Amino acid sequence: MLLSDADTTLILETVRDAARREIMPRFRALSEADINTKSAPDDLVTAADLAAEALITAQLGRAFPAALILGEEAVAANPSLRDQLADAEMAIIIDPVDGTWNYARGLALFGVILAVTRYGVPIYGLLYDPVIDDWIVSSENADTCYTNAHDSRALRLPATPPETKAGGYVPLGSLPDPHRLRVAALWPQIGRLNSLRCACHEFRMLAQGHVDFMLSTRLTPWDHAAGVLVVQQAGGTAKMLDGSAYSAVRRDGYLLSARSADVWSEIQQAFSFLLD
């Protein structure tokens, strides 16, 4: 199964259509009834998530009838859907509004993530910003590219060491309590640590060379499959903290993505205590 240029154009335009019709009109216009919780008080779902996922699922389901369509909200309603991913020759994985907490609170730091996988291996990844209408995209046989209304250019991460201490994204709130203190102790040797509460924009920042690494927990294919491919095809390194290859089928462990193999090794050594 190979994606043609026409296929990837259709996927992109479907995502842009969902953003125009379902996501942006609701931004900063949600009522309390439009916002609900899922697994925790800060795990939110909005009317925009549901409507955008429904639109993308319907349109791509018609275009790719043999594909498994795996949306975050569909899996929330029926977790067994995720079990089909490993055996799917083609799966389209959708995060309709990544960074829902930001979106629901009126912070313009959210995106749409879409990945296509083959038996769990990412072969296409899209990181789309509905606010600016720009995107970073990659596929298994192409460079990672950034595109907006005026420009399109290939992204290539530098192989040279960072000019300052390596800085990146670590979701402290997702780590077990004892590990948070260990991470805090790393600050003097690593540099700035942040979290955007949005994997889409964290991967975008890494792919453009604006940060040096990102550590991901709570593995979900809609958050990570696209970004892993984007980083790898830009010349970076993205694999599990234990050194094994990433698969969208994985449900546990830590994913470490970095601008280069050397930075990956440096950060992996610093965070190796998470493997104990």
Which role fits each region the language model picked out?
Residues M1-V97:
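N-terminal subdomain of lithium-sensitive/metallo-dependent phosphomonoesterases centered on the IMPase/IPPase/PAP
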Residues I23, D49, L60, T100, ...:
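Residue-level signal for inorganic ion chemistry
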Residues T37, D83-A86, V137, T160-T164, ...:
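Solvent-exposed alpha-helices and their adjacent loops that cap or buttress functional pockets
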Residues L50, E73, P96-G99, P130, ...:
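Generic detector of well-ordered alpha-helical packing
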Residues L55, G111, A226-V230:
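Short amphipathic alpha-helical face segments that pack within enzyme cores
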Residues R82-T144:
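DPxDG-like acidic metal-binding loop motif
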Residues P158-D276:
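An extended, acidic
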